[in-house]
Amino acid sequence: MKTLLKSIKITLVFCVFFSVFYILVLWLFAQVAGPNRGNAEVVTLNGKVVGAANVGQTFTEEKYFWGRPSCAGDGYDATSSAGSNKGPTNPEYLAEVEARIDTFLIHHPYLARKDVPAEMVTASASGLDPDITPQSAYVQVKRVAQARGMNVEEVRRVVDKAVEKPLLGIFGTEKVNVLKLNIALEELKNR
């Protein structure tokens, strides 16, 4: 009986610790040391809030760069953040990826099938990725330039400026925030 009571006490202590104290410590750390004090990085255009830089969103128009596909609810639904949990040998998953490749190639007819970046046709684990690799941005430059009536080199320069380097030059990889990139294009248009 003593062992059972000890087990219950330890379980309760750990439940309180991990469900209250630990979360509180993480929240306080984010408030002190986190980017934007642990809050969303709100992005505005012409004084209007258009999104959060740290949560992906869907762009489907030809004049915008597109992010990764999302399996989070009805597309980039932060309340349903999750991957599809389908493995690479799942026939349903393979069919989804093939359909995404076909769709991507329809909008990028200048690409060969082998040149489609894998991240542009596969969803991330969270389903909320706001960033793509520079390669994924560069393969879209021609489409975006044509849709906007801009010079390809001009759009490429916007992408070049949008590339974020790894933290301290060693942590992570180069990335491009899709929302910030599209905002930069809109601001360029408004000049």
UniProtKB/Swiss-Prot annotation:
It is a single-pass membrane protein. GO terms for cellular component: plasma membrane. Its main location: membrane. It comes from the Bacteria. HAMAP family: KdpC. This is Potassium-transporting ATPase KdpC subunit. NCBIfam families: kdpC, PRK00315.1, PRK14002.1. The system is composed of three essential subunits: KdpA, KdpB and KdpC. The keyword Endoplasmic reticulum does not apply. The keyword Ion transport applies. It is found in: Cell inner membrane. Part of the high-affinity ATP-driven potassium transport (or Kdp) system, which catalyzes the hydrolysis of ATP coupled with the electrogenic transport of potassium into the cytoplasm. This subunit acts as a catalytic chaperone that increases the ATP-binding affinity of the ATP-hydrolyzing subunit KdpB by the formation of a transient KdpB/KdpC/ATP ternary complex. It comes from Bacteroides fragilis (strain ATCC 25285 / DSM 2151 / CCUG 4856 / JCM 11019 / LMG 10263 / NCTC 9343 / Onslow / VPI 2553 / EN-2). One of its GO terms (molecular function) is P-type potassium transmembrane transporter activity. The chain crosses the membrane at residues 10-30. Pfam families: KdpC. Belongs to the KdpC family. Keywords: ATP-binding, Cell inner membrane, Cell membrane, Ion transport, Membrane, Nucleotide-binding, Potassium, Potassium transport, Transmembrane, Transmembrane helix, Transport.
